[in-house]
From Swiss-Prot:
Record: active site: 328 (cysteine persulfide intermediate)
Protein name in UniProt: Cysteine desulfurase IscS
Primary role: Master enzyme that delivers sulfur to a number of partners involved in Fe-S cluster assembly, tRNA modification or cofactor biosynthesis. Catalyzes the removal of elemental sulfur atoms from cysteine to produce alanine. Functions as a sulfur delivery protein for Fe-S cluster synthesis onto IscU, an Fe-S scaffold assembly protein, as well as other S acceptor proteins.
Organism: Neisseria meningitidis serogroup B (strain ATCC BAA-335 / MC58)
Source species taxonomy: Bacteria, Pseudomonadati, Pseudomonadota, Betaproteobacteria, Neisseriales
GO terms for biological process, alphabetical: [2Fe-2S] cluster assembly
Reactions the enzyme catalyzes: (sulfur carrier)-H + L-cysteine = (sulfur carrier)-SH + L-alanine
Quaternary structure and partners: Homodimer. Forms a heterotetramer with IscU, interacts with other sulfur acceptors.
Localization in the cell: Cytoplasm
Binding-site residues for [2Fe-2S] cluster, renumbered to this chain: 328
Length: 404
């Protein structure tokens, strides 16, 4: 089996741009280059038409109206605009916000910034499977709660939260519900009407589109108001000023159009690859899948290998492009805060690999990856005195390690 290495298995960080998307974008760089806001000539009109077509394609994927789509520079900006924008606008109603400990840093750090501004934030724990306990959420809601923010799909462990149930709870209590759907679009069906979502963050590049473009869905009925965070020419109905990058928007629109059309075949492809990988690593002892395997996107596997050190594992499988933790925080040597929130100990949190498949991943590549990991785990464990002690039946938790 000859497989071209390194094998790219880090699609949750970013996939390549789909060739069909790239082809659609190119004319808007050189030929149809007008500014969509130039309304006095055909260059501007053509660009605006392309932007509105993309807006409609993005809205269609999430069952929204195209007037509810606001373009941003990416999901990080969408999260900032949604959370800060709503918190500032509804300040007179209350100053309490609720989110989850396993959210993306773009949500957690935005919440921390609001805490510095005097808001109160409750960070919910998750269960061992990574899912939010709805009773815990209900108990956290107060009279002055104005916003709840929960991600649809977790970027590290791929678990899918019960967004419709949370939407129901929030709508009943007239609380604004924000969802970070960067990892959900194109992986699971997203319907903002059925799920009663008020604000939804989206990313272009996570769906085989270009980087540097995202969108925020802002509900019109019942209407949600936001305070703008970026001021200027009043673009995007005043929500987000700045010249619209037509080529990026066209790319994101085409990516979302393809994602809607090919969701079923992508899902079948991912499930097949996942089965091949899980079969390939069968028989390795002390392997833990992080996060619920049922309520999960089909292209994500986050696996901890006990008695193997994370950094040495990444180096041992250098023929694979995988990550431990998310790309946004993998430069840090701290164990993943998401895995810690599941109750994993430092050792298991440190020995995790996030393996994420994509549209372009082949069965041969996944087979190769599983076999490589299996052989390297064996070699690394041979070098581990802890593994030897574990195999000898010694309970490592009962040992008092001497401090030096």
């Amino acid at each position: 089996m000859t497989v071209k290495t390194p094998v790219y298995l880090d699609y949750a960080a970013t996939p390549p741009v789909d060739k069909r998307v790239a082809e659609k974008m190119i004319p808007y760089l050189t030929e149809t280059f007008g500014n969509p806001a130039s309304n006095s000539h055909s260059f501007g009109w053509e660009a605006e038409e392309a932007v509105e077509k993309a807006r409609a394609d993005i809205a269609a994927l999430i069952n929204a109206d195209s007037k509810e789509i606001v373009f941003t520079s990416g999901a990080t900006e969408s999260n900032n605009l949604a959370i800060k924008g709503a918190a500032h606008f509804y300040k007179s109603k209350g100053n309490h916000l609720i989110t989850v400990k396993t959210e993306h840093k773009a949500v957690l750090d935005t919440m921390r910034e609001l805490e510095r501004q005097g808001y109160e934030v409750t960070y919910l724990d998750v269960q061992e499977n990574g899912l939010v306990d709805l009773d815990v959420l209900k108990a956290a809601i107060r009279e002055d709660t104005i916003l709840v923010s929960v991600m649809w799909v977790n970027n590290e462990i791929g678990v899918v939260q019960d967004i419709p149930a949370i939407g129901e709870i929030c709508r009943e209590r007239k609380i604004i519900f924000h969802v970070d759907a960067a990892q959900a679009c194109g992986k699971v069906p997203v319907d903002v009407e059925a799920a009663k979502v008020d604000l939804l963050s989206m990313s272009g590049h996570k769906v085989y589109g270009p980087k540097g473009i995202g969108a925020l869905y802002v509900r019109r009925k019942p209407r949600v108001r936001l305070e703008a965070q970026m001021h200027g020419g009043g673009h995007e109905r005043g929500f987000r000023s700045g010249t619209l990058p037509t080529h990026q928007i066209v790319g994101m629109g085409e990516a979302f159009r393809i994602a809607k059309e090919e969701l079923a075949q992508d899902t079948a492809h991912y499930l097949k690859l996942r089965d091949i990988f899980l079969k390939g690593i069968e028989g390795i002892e002390e392997v833990y899948i992080n996060g619920d395997l049922e309520h999960r996107v089909p292209n994500n596997l986050n696996v901890s290998f006990n008695f193997v050190e994370g950094e040495s594992l990444i180096m041992a499988v250098k023929e694979l492009a995988v990550s431990s933790g998310s790309a946004c925080t993998s430069a840090s040597l701290e164990p993943s805060y998401v895995l810690r929130a599941l109750g994993r100990n430092d050792e298991l949190a440190h020995s995790s690999l996030r393996i994420t498949f994509g549209r372009m991943t082949t069965e041969e590549e996944v087979q190769f990856a599983a076999e490589l990991i299996k052989s390297k785990i064996g070699k690394l464990r041979e070098l581990s005195p802890l593994w030897e002690m574990f195999k000898d039946g010694i309970d490592l938790n009962s040992i008092e390690w001497a401090a030096h």
